[in-house]
Amino acid sequence: MTSHPNQSPALTSYFSRLERRQGVSKPRAFVASAEGAALCSWGDTTLPLALGGVTRFFTLAMVLREVDRGALTLETPVADILSPHHIAGLCVVGGVDHSNSITIGHLLSHRSGIADYFSPPHKRVNTLRDQILRSDRSWSVEQALEIARHYPGAFIPGTARHVNFSRTNYLLLGEVLTKSTGMSFDALVDLRIISPLGLKRTYVFTRDYYDRYFSLAPVTNGATPLHIPQALASFGADGALISSAADTVAFLRGFWNGALCDKSWLETITAHPLRSSTAPPLSVGVMIAPLPGTSTGLGAQADPTGIAAGINIQTGVCAMVSTHRVGTLQGAMKDLVALMAIV
């Protein structure tokens, strides 16, 4: 086990438990106060990691910035931004296409009803998730949307008392950002997040970076390392960000401090979370989890590859933890909550 003599016994015990898990060898974590003081550092916090679903936090920040500047609202119909061929047929319920009623807010909060292109709910389907666990492959946004159209909408957009977690939502938000700004997703991340915050180890993984894949912290499925550069580049606004633990926490602090979008959004994006059968409770753009023994909660994003990052809604303490092992969204969130409860 990695030696960290300055960490508390509780933190040492926490990381020891992570390292004893099958397939986990070098977990990484970084925690900082809202002011930037390091509260916990474990492993190499400068090593680049594939953030997976934590990318959605970055996408959220850029969408909220578009709302701040008046280009969008949460009530803006997606059909007002994207062309009909993007939208048509994405949420058909009872034979009626409700896709034109999907709003920006519905996409952010997973209340669009659109099926998850990556891991649709039907059994006996050879999903993209199953495929990339066996061998690498790529896909386009258009192909992902076509997969989603094969499945009925989970509900009429905005009407259900629960959410339907769907990676398709954030692929669409990436397309919305490209349309509303006239910039590619990777260029926008550089302009709106990387440059203002001075992040040195953060970038969007595209086909231009295939040769960098082996520089990333390895992710394992059981005992098998995943080699999926094509898939990683295909995730786009839903999962293609590369960053280090330290850079990710710097991003979260920027979000908390209002450097990326108006700070008043924190209350909106963490209010009234709704349950999900396949993910932790979701609000507008973040997963919500209570912190044991406190009256506050955690606004976070996570990925089944064992990575999660979030903000203590009350104190602004920001954290990221990664085990680099394929598991579940809920499992990654539990690891983050357990870490935040200690610090």
Whereabouts are the PLM-identified features?
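A structural signal for well-ordered alpha-helical segments within the folded catalytic domains
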Residues: 9, 57-61, 76, 102-105, ...
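Active-site SXXK
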Residues: 15, 50-78, 173-178, 248, ...
